[in-house]
């Protein structure tokens, strides 16, 4: 039996070696190529093929291990429709040759021959999908009413209509889309059926959230909204793209719209590698990956995408590494629970989901990275400027590690830099060594316009079995770390500085099936409030059970002038809500928690972090001591993705009782 296995393995190795030995490269150049060349000629970079159309018609003849190489500096218009798989050790490779910029696969069409319709609106024939409009390289929002902010509605009927008592029929909005902020974290796009009086009736479509009375809406995708430069509307019946230019000449601008839904469409094909390419202007997704195994996207740039840059469904062993993803209207990378064993590493993802109403409906949108597969690694990514969550992940044994996330919850809120909301009861999730800064929040279109709900790390309803360690969170509008109806959470060695509240544990049970906060362990963290309006910690419950939340001890707390409001609690006793405020000393005496925790001074403090992959050395102008009483005289050295709080020696006194 063992001899037979060895022979089979040897035979497989020989076959794979032979496949690789006979693998060939096919060359493409949009500037020098000719599609009339033979396949033998196309193996020579001096006689390349020209177009993506030629690639798609020839694809069935490509063999495992073959390479498709595009000339650097060239632009290829259209899309790639994959119709062949590679092999486990011999993937089909898409790459580049020559010198210069990355070759670009471009899904845009240029609009020309503009005709004045009236009132500053011009039209151009548009035979394409027209999901996006790009003006001089900048994505434009659909025309909308009002031009900014939200109108509000007083009532609704199910998920079918809203009524705004101030809206009248001076302008009839009987077509287009109504964009409704149904909750703080949901912006839905619904097709309008009719407008009568103050009532707009719409199709629910695939949206399931019901509107909240008093929240906001606006109208878009209707020609009557066009009154600001760059606003647009596509009349798909008459194939007409209408754009408001005002008194400007449209011929002085480069105007593009999406000509393809997907730039790379992979459905049930495996073992493909895309390396060193640029993908621009997909109407929907630059990469649409369905039931396909071992797809690798490496060192690529993905720009100006109509929904997500990369969306994958039931596609295990997906790798996205060393890529730059910029200006995606709905999401950066989106992977469902079938995308197990994924690796998302060392990518830069920026400007995601920043135009309200231009992303997709429902949850899991306006996010940089969304992942629900088991054994996923999300590591060393840089996320900058995202409409909602920086990273939303779940899945058994999945990890978010050493990511740098800054400026999030810019379009929606009640979200976080790193968010886990796990109704699937997965276990062994880890949040390690991340740096999360600038949780902004956006409460426009809600009843709470003075409250910004942006958390640094947010562990939401029914989540369990999470380790949160060695993270740095600062400058978040609401909470640094928030635990909401979750259990079995370990919070160790984190530095939480200058957030609205540094540690928040909230149990409310608005949803009857939510977990109770139990068996949590909070130790060796630094919770540093910088202003009088901030708290170091806040605990709340709909019962009288804060003592059952878990073990909280050996932490470092700091608040200005040892404020009485440094720590707050809220619980229900004998049917009445009891709100309390504490100094650390009083909190210890009343809660039985934080027995070995200490207070830090707030004056003459130095906070530094290192959000890079290299060791960082910081020169010190005076002598400092860290919270563990280690002294630093001339410099402090920080490892990658670490931070430190230093206290000038003259002010350091650690109070533990």
What is the predicted function of each stretch?
Residues 603-657:
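C-terminal beta-sandwich/jelly-roll accessory domains of carbohydrate-active enzymes
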Residues 8-17:
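Bacterial N-terminal signal peptides
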Residues 119-123, 257-263, 283-285, 306-311, ...:
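Extracellular beta-strand/beta-solenoid scaffold signature
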Residues 21-23:
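Boundary at the C-terminal end of the N-terminal hydrophobic targeting segment
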Residues 270-281, 293-306, 316-330, 339-358, ...:
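Right-handed parallel beta-helix
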């Amino acid at each position: 039996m063992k001899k037979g296995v060895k022979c089979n393995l040897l035979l497989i190795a020989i076959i794979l070696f032979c496949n690789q030995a006979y693998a060939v490269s096919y060359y493409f150049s949009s500037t020098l190529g000719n599609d009339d060349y033979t396949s033998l000629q196309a193996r020579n970079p001096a006689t390349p093929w020209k177009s993506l159309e030629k690639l798609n018609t020839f694809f069935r003849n490509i063999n495992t291990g073959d390479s498709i190489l595009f000339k650097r500096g060239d632009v290829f218009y259209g899309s790639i429709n994959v119709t062949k798989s590679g092999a486990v050790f011999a993937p089909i490779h898409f790459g580049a040759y020559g010198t210069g910029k990355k070759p670009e696969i471009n899904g845009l069409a240029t609009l020309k021959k503009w005709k004045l319709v009236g009132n500053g609106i011009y039209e151009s024939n548009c035979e394409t999908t027209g999901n996006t409009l790009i003006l001089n390289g900048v994505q434009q929002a659909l025309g909308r009413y009002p031009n900014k902010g939200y109108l509000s509605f007083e009532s609704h009927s199910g998920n079918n209509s809203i009524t705004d008592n101030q809206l009248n029929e001076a302008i009839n909005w009987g077509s287009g889309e109504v964009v409704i902020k149904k909750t703080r974290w949901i912006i839905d796009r619904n097709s309008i059926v009719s407008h009568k009086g103050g009532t707009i009736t719409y199709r629910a479509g695939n949206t399931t959230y019901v509107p909240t009375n008093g929240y906001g809406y606006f109208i878009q995708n209707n020609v009557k909204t066009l009154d600001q430069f760059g606003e647009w509307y596509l009349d798909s019946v008459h194939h007409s793209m209408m754009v408001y230019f005002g008194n400007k000449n449209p011929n002085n601008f480069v105007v593009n719209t999406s000509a393809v839904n997907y730039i790379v469409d992979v459905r049930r094909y495996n073992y493909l590698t895309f390396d060193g390419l640029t993908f621009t202007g997909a109407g929907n997704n630059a990469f649409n990956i369905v039931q396909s195994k071992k797809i690798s996207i490496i060192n690529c740039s993905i720009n100006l995408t109509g929904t997500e840059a990369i969306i994958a469904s039931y596609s295990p062993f997906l790798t996205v590494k060393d890529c730059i993803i910029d200006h995606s209207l709905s999401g950066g990378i989106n992977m469902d629970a079938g995308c197990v064993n994924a690796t998302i590493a060392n990518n830069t993802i920026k400007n995601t989901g920043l135009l309200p109403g231009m992303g997709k409906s429902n949850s899991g949108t306006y996010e940089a990275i969304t992942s629900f597969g088991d054994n996923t690694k999300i590591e060393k990514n840089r996320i900058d400027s995202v409409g909602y969550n920086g990273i939303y992940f779940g899945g058994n044994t999945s990890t978010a590690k050493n990511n740098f996330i800054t400026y999030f919850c810019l379009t929606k809120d009640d979200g976080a830099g790193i968010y886990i909301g796990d109704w699937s009861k997965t276990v062994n999730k880890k949040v390690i060594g991340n740096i999360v800064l600038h949780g902004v929040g956006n409460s426009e279109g809600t009843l709470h316009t003075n409250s910004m709900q942006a958390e640094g790390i947010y562990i939401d309803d029914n989540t369990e079995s999470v380790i949160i360690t060695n993270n740095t969170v600062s400058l978040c509008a609401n909470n640094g770390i928030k635990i909401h109806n979750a259990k079995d959470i370990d919070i160790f060695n984190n530095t939480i500085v200058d957030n609205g509240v540094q540690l928040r544990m909230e149990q409310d049970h608005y949803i009857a099936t939510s977990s109770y906060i139990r068996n949590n362990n909070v130790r060796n963290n630094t919770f540093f409030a910088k202003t009088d309006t901030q708290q170091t910690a806040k605990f709340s419950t709909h019962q009288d059970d804060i003592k059952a939340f878990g073990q909280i001890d050996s932490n470092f707390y700091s608040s200005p002038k040892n404020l009485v409001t440094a720590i707050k609690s809220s619980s229900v006793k004998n049917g009445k809500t009891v709100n309390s405020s504490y100094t650390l000393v009083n909190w210890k005496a009343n809660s039985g928690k934080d027995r070995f925790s200490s207070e830090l001074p707030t004056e003459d403090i130095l906070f530094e972090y290192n959000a890079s992959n290299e060791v960082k050395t910081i020169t010190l102008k005076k002598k400092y001591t860290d919270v563990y009483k280690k002294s630093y005289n001339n410099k402090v050295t920080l490892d990658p993705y670490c931070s430190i709080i230093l206290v000038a020696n003259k002010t350091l006194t650690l109070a533990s009782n």
